[in-house]
Amino acid sequence: MNIQQLLSEKIRHAMIAAGAQQPAEPAVRQSGKPQFGDYQANGIMGAAKKLGLNPREFAQKVLDNLNLDGIAEKLEIAGPGFINIFLSKNWLVCHADEMLSAVNFGIKTAKPQTIVVDYSSPNVAKEMHVGHLRSTIIGDAVVRTLEFLGNHVIRANHVGDWGTQFGMLIAYLEKMENENASAMQLSDLEAFYRAAKEHYDNDEAFAEKARNYVVKLQSGDEYCRIMWKKLVDITMRHNQENYDRLNVTLTEKDVMGESLYNPMLPEIVADLKKQGLAVEDDGALVVYLDEFKNKDGDPMGVIVQKKDGGYLYTTTDIAAAKYRCHKLHADRVLVFSDSRQSQHMQQAWLITRKAGYVPDSFSLEHPFFGMMLGKDGKPFKTRTGGTVKLKDLLDEAVERADKLIAERNPDLTAEEKAAVVEAVAIGSVKYSDLSKNRTTDYVFDWDNMLTFEGNTAPYMQYAYTRIRSIFARAGIEPNSLNDDIVLTDDKERVLVIKLLQFEEALNGVAKDGMPHILCQYLYELAGMFSAFYEACPILNAERPIKNSRLKLAALAAKTLKQGLDLLGIKTVEKM
């Protein structure tokens, strides 16, 4: 049930019937204050202005053409021309009952799309660090939400699995006569990487061999491909451990690395040159874009092939866009990477469109995110200034959560405690990030995330557990409740409206790639349930009020659990 969408469609038709120009935009929003109704239509004044009419008079014309029988119990014109909508109690009750019993809350997408979501994207032969956290968890929350809404989602883990570094790694593995590379731990591989780089910088013979291996690898040499595949497999096995711990849905089948697009690059560059988009400049092939200016005010040049014949990230991203459109048949692509990549993505996609590689209807979106900062406002680092490994961060989260839970509930069994600690530790790291607007820099603070106060994972997880405990005390299963929902208190009405707004929150996440919209919704829902619980006795009430309130509690628990699951955060039955 998407109340906002339903009201928007009906008011739009009424506006057009009243004489508004198409496309009429009713601008229906949730009301901030109860005296202004449950929803407001704010687009009447803009439509009236275009027609040269008095807004209040036009609002009355809209009401004359608006049929909300059975949906709204009252409509009123307010201020300079707002329309306030007060929803019918019977209508709310009917849809709350449907939402509780329906599969997927009765949520369906009218026009499901095929959507490619590019996220996480770590580099091969390097361990995942905190810099990969935001892309991984934000992307995964959006993926889960898009799938829940009925879309076909293709996960694309665009790993850095190609480049000159593989020549030196293969050469160094050979030098060490380490044919058992696939059994190595990634930490060893990182040490290999540093040692290989040192040899490459200081040993010309080694560097020459490494360069030869790059050429051989790129030309498909079998030995080099085998060694390269070992490096990729070791890395992805280790990354999978992080994904599993983070409760992220990526698997090895989602890997679509840079190497996937290599065969397309020569043809793309040749075509860009043939179309006159790419021109030679000092031996390199460059596309000049009028839409971007350099510091001198001239069109900015974007290199698509280097002087030595090598390709760049831009070339690969052009190929990726083309591949996702024509091979994966996507309607929409979302690439989750940090804000510093914005210009790069805009330029790559502008070239893609200028070359005619994708239709205008093909949506290319870059939902970027800000940096992860320490409490000092600087990029998040170890105490010695090094990069924080993702594994180490998660280990510390578990240690801290263990202390928090031990203090809060020492009576948990060892098995119960382990489950709660893992859920709280990983949930806290994820929720603390996901609850912030992704476009801003985010300050990582253990004290603010591992607490049962405020908009945190522990608070949300406890809110769910608290509701479940009501049913445990009552000895009742939620699906055994057959009485109708009845609303006898304003707190019940407010709670039902919030529950029915679940789909609106999910659509916000899907439309803009912003999980914080769902976090805010869940936090408000938990607060409204708490207010309802304080004001409206449940277990001490007489039937049918008792069962009605139990149904509201069941729907609140179901919604909280589903919402947290879409964020990739686990719930527990006991804390």
UniProtKB/Swiss-Prot annotation:
Q: What is its EC number?
A: 6.1.1.19
What protein name does the entry list?
Arginine--tRNA ligase
PROSITE patterns in the cross-refs: AA_TRNA_LIGASE_I
Main location per UniProt? cytoplasm
Please give the catalytic activity noted in the UniProt record: tRNA(Arg) + L-arginine + ATP = L-arginyl-tRNA(Arg) + AMP + diphosphate
Source organism: Actinobacillus succinogenes (strain ATCC 55618 / DSM 22257 / CCUG 43843 / 130Z)
Compartments where located: Cytoplasm
Q: How does it assemble?
A: Monomer.
One Gene Ontology molecular-function label: arginine-tRNA ligase activity
Q: Does the keyword Cytoplasm apply?
A: yes
What positions does the record give for the motif labelled 'HIGH' region?
Answer: 122-132
Q: Which domain of life is it from?
A: Bacteria
Query: What gene codes for this chain?
Result: argS
Q: Which GO terms describe its biological process?
A: arginyl-tRNA aminoacylation
